[in-house]
Amino acid sequence: LEVEKEHHCAGLRVYYKGVTGIKEGNYIELHFLKDFLPGYFWIFPLADGQCNVGVGMRSDYVGKKRINLKTELNNIIQKYPQLSERFKNAEPVDDIRGYGLPLGSKKRAISGDNYMLIGDAASLIDPFTGEGIGNAILSGYTAAQQAKEAIESKNFSGTALKKYDEAIYRRLGDELSLSYRMQKLVKYPWLFNFVVRKANRNKVLRETIMVMFEDIDIRDRLRKPSF
């Protein structure tokens, strides 16, 4: 199948040990850096004290701008003082690896005669954060429920299994759509900077952004002008 690059993210990751400055609670970090927009740099703390470190950018921009993600990953760690200091004594513990991330920014059919797609196969990765584990678990659970119903009714037709699509998009559709709009915001540095500056001055907005990855109702508040 041909990759729809505007709905696909190219990403690189490497595991590090010794990264400092990890906040209590092991929050994930997304760094939107001026020279790397509309891409982002991430630090995901792991249970063993290591960190998943990487970069991601929509595949169409990687192609248009001829971005070398491996070069950018190393440059970001070395170039920005707020990061280079934290990586001063850190060491990679494996090789850099590349991944393609199918984003949930486009609604697709995720079932048909005798099959249902879950997780990355269903393109359910969050278009803004790049996170996909939660949606993969949810889709797997939902598919299992639908499979049970199909077995009991002995009906594995696309028409019957379409209930799975409906259940997934009823639960995730608004969230994925909102994340796609937020992804587009990053394309406009002046507007993105405006939001960040406002967050620095507004505690409610700042806390909303911090927890937006966990709650669709809270994330939806970002669309309202009351901030």
List each model region and its residues.
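Flexible, active-site-adjacent loop/turn segments at secondary-structure boundaries
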Residues: A10, V14, I28-L30, K34, ...
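Short capping/connector residues at structural and topological boundaries
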Residues: E6, G21, D35, F41, ...
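FAD/FMN-dependent oxidoreductases across multiple families
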Residues: G63-Q146, E152
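Generic structural signal for well-ordered, non-membrane alpha-helical segments
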Residues: K5, K65-L73, R108, N114, ...
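C-terminal helical "tail/cap" subdomain of flavin- and related membrane-associated enzymes
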Residues: K148-F227
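Predominantly flavin-linked oxidoreductase catalytic cores and closely associated redox partners
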Residues: L1-F87, P102
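Short, charged low-complexity linear motifs
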Residues: G25-L30, Q146-E152
